[in-house]
Amino acid sequence: MNPVEKLALLRVEMKKRHLDAYVVVTDDFHASEYVGAHFKAREFLSGFTGSAGTLVVLPDAAALWTDGRYFLQASQQLEGSGIELMRMGQPGVPEIPAFLRDHVPENGWIGFDSRTISNDFARSIGEKTREKRIRFAGDEDLVDLVWTDRPALSCEPLWELDVQYAGLTRREKLAMVRGKMKEMGASVFVIPSLDEVAWLLNLRGNDVLFTPVFLSYLLLEQDTATLCVQREAVSAEIEAHLKSDGVTLAPYDDIYRLVAALPTGTRVLLDGERANYRILQSVPESAEVLDRTSPIQLMKAVKTPAEQENERLAHIKDGVAVTRFIYWLKHTIGKEPITELSASKKLESLRAEGEHYLEQSFDPILAYGAHGAIVHYEPTEETDIPMEPRGLCLADTGAQYLEGTTDITRTIALGPLTDEEKRIYTLVLRGHIQLGAAKFLHGCMGENLDMLARTPLWEAGLDFNHGTGHGVGFVLGVHEGPERVHWDVKRQKRHCVIEEGMIFSNEPGIYLAGKFGVRIENLVVVREAEVNEYGRFLALEPLTLVPYDRDAIDLSLLSSRDVELLNAYHAKVFAAISPYLSGDELEWLKEATEPVQFC
């Protein structure tokens, strides 16, 4: 079936239930960024494969909202579907709640699966549509009636992350969170986020592609903890370990029953941005809801010394693999056929040679030429193209190791470049290395740092429509909060001070539609630089250790400071990576990291 046929079947079900609109989001029951195959309802209906987007289906129309990363991709994939593309943040584009207010009649009904809609999103719709007395119907997943061959819920075995990697035991983490609960006046903490449950319990799984988590909820009290999980995924050994730390098991779907049974006067802590609407609706009226940012977010974001050291080890392994890949690509292009997909598979195979490699950390982006202008392009059998010994290849990839999570982008010259390609590459590189060299007082937030990366681009009248940096989990999600580097404070729902031990990305880019794209990305860890009478200064240490492409740099555009920073980084790369290379690969790395001279 194509999207037109699928939407027609969905509208039949909507009509049976007298629904005036049906909302289909990208999320699973846990507001995860990446979701298992079972939860890809929006993709199934619309054909749009991006990782962010919301579909609204009306009786005679449909619209899909997505952000700037996916404007080009969505416009291509939605063609002929009858679904209007809503470019979020652009002039004249309504937000979803306002759209629903304007298109649903008075006393009408909006349907959705309330397990996939966040409490915050449902509340925003309710506030916007209240005057028209529009009601919600959230008990049914109508997509399930249309998607006849829908994949089952994943149920992969859990595994324990040893304290040598985590740095804190399960008991220590539980005590930390219970301490925060006391501070916040909460008697119960409902934890629906898969990464938070995994972090807190030092457990990992394989229920979500690219993210080693497992389908679960945790109900935490001062003296008890109940893990709602698919029982067949938990070995007897892990169950015994959990029990010894005061954690008991319950069926996965029991979370709603357990919340509904909370006694009168219970003060329930939950994060409305992460808790689904059905959880909130299950809370008894006699209980008090404390809608707060989850305290686990910040705990998880500030990496332990053990996590930081393990991440350094992971990035050396990753740096070796990516460096070998760049060498292979530059020396093979034009001699053997190489496509975007075959290059992607080559890089994955090189990473898999590393000890303790688990999986990729997201869908790899190998984008040649004009495909590089599609910010989150992912090559498929339908879109794959051959690469030629000229122009640029944008490679944004990452991996999961026992020692940590990686995310790196390198834009690679495959042969001769135009002056425009070199100019854009060099401007992006300047912003990237200037942010990487930041030294700042504690108390700064991501929006304070963002302009360091954008200034060389803004001075040239250029910009990019995505964040400059995102937090990264430890053997968890490649994107996490609460830290974020973005200049536009209007887009920031929650603001976060940059703390020592945080790990986030530094990834400016420029994308020229129909031509090419350039993005350069390192992960950095925040460390203390100095403390003096002015305060506590922090700095950024690069974790990613892979050479930039000297073949793409216009040296005349670099300042003396830029040259100094570039050479210092390349010296660090050579020192870390060279012991693991030999022969021609080592000789190439020497050349790739040779100091450049200021023009």
Task: Describe the residue ranges of each PLM region.
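Active-site neighborhoods and metal-handling regions in enzymes and metal-associated proteins
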Residues: 1-599
